[in-house]
Amino acid sequence: MKKRLLQVIAFVCVTVTSFLLCSCGEKNDSGNNLDAENIRAEHKVTNSLHKGVENIPDTGKPFIVDGASEYKIVASNYGSHKNAVAKAAGFISSHINSATGVALEVIDGDSDIEWSSSAKLVVVGSEKLQQAAGFRKTADDIGLAGYQIQTVGNSVFVWADGDNGYNLAALALLRVLVGYDCLDLDTYIYTKDGSYLPEMDIVERPDFDYRVDQTLYTVAAPRAYSMGFNQGEPYMTDDPCHTTFYFLPPKVYESENKDWFSNQRCNFVDDQDNYLVHAAQLCYTAHGKPEELKKMQELIADQIMYLTLEKYPDRNLVTVGQQDEDVVCNCDSCMAVVDKYGSIAAAIIPFINGIDDIVQSRLKAYAEEHNQPVKETNILFLSYQSTRFAPKFDDSLKFNDHVGVLICSSKTRYSYTFWDDINVVDKEQTENWQPFGNVYYFYYEINSNNYFVPCNTFRACVENYRFAKINNGRLMTSMGNWKTPYTSSFTAFKSYLNSRLWFNVNYDYVDLEKTFFDNYYGDGGVYMKKFFDEMTSYMDYMRDSGNADFNGVVVNEFTYTAKYWPIKMLQRWNNYCDLALKKIEKTKALNDGTYEALHDRILLETLFPRYIICKYHAAKFSETEIASMRKAFYDDTQYFNLTHESQYETFESLWKGWGLK
């Protein structure tokens, strides 16, 4: 038995009297502990671009001196990225001011600025000043999200080739200058005073070009910018996955174009307009009729052109993904494809490639007509349910350059890693898609059946994100908590982990954990860390004891029962929160909102144990006591605007059952 498990068992044994753990754990009949975390090796990636970020020396040239600076920020005001440049420049100035008390002037445009080696400038964009200074753009492929930061003379040059690149460049420059980090909305830390200008020669590209955090479901634009997530969504449709009936709605086309739709039926009512849909999916061969297939592709291409050029010119991804039904068309043409390749995906790939051929041709013509770069537009389909497994590979099934597969790993046990035996099928699934072309990832780090039971992926996610990067992922999405703005169980910490690890999966988990708990809860962090450590250690123990209910699969039906959550353990964790609240009392005197912010962060974490107590341990209290506890829980969920008990259930039935509605 490995050292880590011995430590966890020691924790359990010491606390067995108060926590009653002996009565709530289930042992593996074989006597074998899965013990995945204890034998888990690190898999650092080597296919990333992070140059010049280690051991950056100072130039010895003063940057902030005695509460003042000679530096100015120049923001280029021409070109397709001028708005992103202006925002980055303003963001840099604002946070240098927050960190040092010094506000650097932002000059809008470079027309009146002349370069000299003695000039003290932070130049964002500006081809003119780059050329004058001899700034050489990197030959590395930085894509649309990468950037370059270089010290030239007394000045600093910041360059990117995309709006998101300028966003990330601003964060990177602030990290070097003032030790910037963002833990949450309006929660910033600075660990440097900006005294001297560093000697920078940085070239970076985030490990995932697209980083969509749904841990908190809706990520406000300022929060996304400050943490380095994509603002809004990079997708061009509201649903990022199941979109085929968005492009070819059965209500419009089904009756007159039966060849476009599957002959497998499901008969469901469309949520949007109450229309009874008969077809389960599209038919990706149009029942063997090429002329009909071409009509389908042209119609979808028309809509993609509108989305990418008019509605969402700042977005680059559009999914043409099958409906959320695990059936496929079984016409003779489709079955011939399945018989040959083993998957209906072999029909979907040429279907999507054909759409892409039309779209890319039109985008190129549009760019030539308007004398501008070709708008990057990537079209995705899903590896999900009937298309979970890759077809047999041959060259005819290679993706076009702007086509990719969005791997939706809904069967994965996310409390383990892809390298653990329990996930071997999902690991092979992902690896088998690699020869085809671009891959994108959609992870289900969520307890979809109950949002108030922790989703214990905090440590395992590090290796799972590395796995995605090693396997050439361009996008990372964590489904998180769908349809609710926040939940308890340290989801704010998970979101912070995502913000840092999706940029560089090689970051050290221990360092990130320390940064978060040392700062996010103020002086109460020491008790919140105790809560977190005990909660995750307990769940690790339950998982590694072979308890399938704690394996991190998206639907964990049985984790929310009284037997798994002894009341004394829950009360202990709530007590930690009470102690944390006492530790922050002194911040009331600041009278600047600090106490209120810290209070709310700690209060939010009480909701998980209180929920379990109120719902599953009610019989241990008098009617008056439990009614009061439930009313207090209700009031706090209203305060935080928490609407959903699970992915598909609001709190309404619970409130009615408790007599609160």
Where are the language model's segments positioned?
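Contiguous, structured surface segment used for ligand recognition
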Residues: 38-203
